[in-house]
Amino acid sequence: IIGSFYVIYYQLEKINVKTFVGITIGLTIGLLISFADNLEVANSSLIIFFSGMIAISGMILPGLSGSYLLLLMGNYTLIMVDSVNALYYTLTEIVSLNFEFINDPERLYLLKVLVLFTVGSISGLVFFSNILSSLLKNHKSITISIIVGFIAGSLLGVWPWKNEDIYGNVSLFIPDFTTTETWTTLFFLFIGILFVVLLERLAHK
C-alpha cells in the first residue's frame, strides 16, 4: 500500500489549492474508515452487492486494489476466503456426485455471498468504468489527489501492530524494535514497497 502511495503520488503534476483540497477530502474519508467502529456489516445482501461494485472500482483506479478496499470494509475474509472455500468444496462435492451441501445453511449462505459479490463486480465494471475513465481523463489532478489522500488516511486501518480487547476495541501501538519479529516485518514491508515500485518502473519501459 505504501508502494502504491509512492507511485500514485508522483502522478500528481503539481500541488495547488485544488489538489490540496482533493488530498484533504481523501484523507478525511480514509481516516473515517480507519477509525470507524463496527464497520463490518457483511450479513447484508445489499452491502455484499455494493462491496463487489466498490472492489471492482479499485481495480480500475490507479494505486488501489479491490482486496485492500474489502479489507477496509471488513468483508475480505467472508468474501475472499470463506465464500471462495465454500465454492471449492461445493464443486468438489458435485464432481463426486455428493449433493448434501444443499442441506447446509451456512454453505448456501456463503455461495449466495459469492453470487451477490460477482453480480456486484460485473455491475460495477459496467457502471463505473466509463465514469472513472472520464474522471481520470477530464479531472485527473483532483481524482488522483483524492486517491492519494484516501490511501494515506486509510493506512491506519491496516497497521500491523494493534491490540484488541475483549470488547472488540482496537488500539494501535509502536512496535518493539529490539525483537526479531519487528525487524522481520519491516524487512518484508520494504520488500513489498520495492516490488511495487519496480513493477511500476518496468511497466513504463
What are these regions (language model features)?
Residues 1-61, 65-205:
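Multi-pass membrane proteins that catalyze or facilitate reactions on polyprenyl-/lipid-phosphate substrates
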